Amino acid sequence: GLYMNQHHLGKNDARGFEDSERLLINRALDAAVFETSPLHILNEGLAYDRCQVGVVTNMPETTPILMDQHDIQGPDQMRTVIRTQVDLVLPEGAAVLNAQDDAVVGLAELSDGEVLYYAQDANNPHLSAHRQQGGRAVYCQEGFVTLARGDQETQLFHLDMEMISRLLTQGLHINTLLAVVATGWSLGITPLLIRAGLKNFGQKHDQVSKDLARMNG
């Protein structure tokens, strides 16, 4: 669907060019988040020329529609489609990539900006190699979602935290949670604010403001 802040504007598939453009031309918005798919990219392209953050959660397999309409027969052709999102990352931006998918990791070289990996396992080899070079990563360790830059680690929150536990019970996948955290961090949002945002997910703006004011003393 299509959301603006907490307002649900439409229930239909909003991944198309028209809905994306609708958000981009809205002067009341400071940021927008878009989801897309290989078919949408091939049929319409993306509504933006560059982006601050590009997230790739997995390398999809081809489908009969993609094969029939666009001759996407296998992994090599699919890579040329999915790389579009990474190609558009600004030099001052970041590509957020799933380190658990080797094909996604292979897109890192295409980013003009920083690369930030996420994985459930702190010992993921791609993630570990990235950290050895001073890179940033997000992962789970002893039940804590953890931020790392090189060998420096920050425990953000435990998966048992009330709101997180509830969302996971309702079907939120841990990989999605890690991608969300990594995206927020790549945008320069502080760990404190990321934690507060997740803790207060779905609450009204006034209540969130009160909680943040309380945290700031």
Can you describe what each PLM-predicted range is?
Residues 43-216:
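Acidic, Mg2+-coordinating active-site environments of NTP-dependent enzymes
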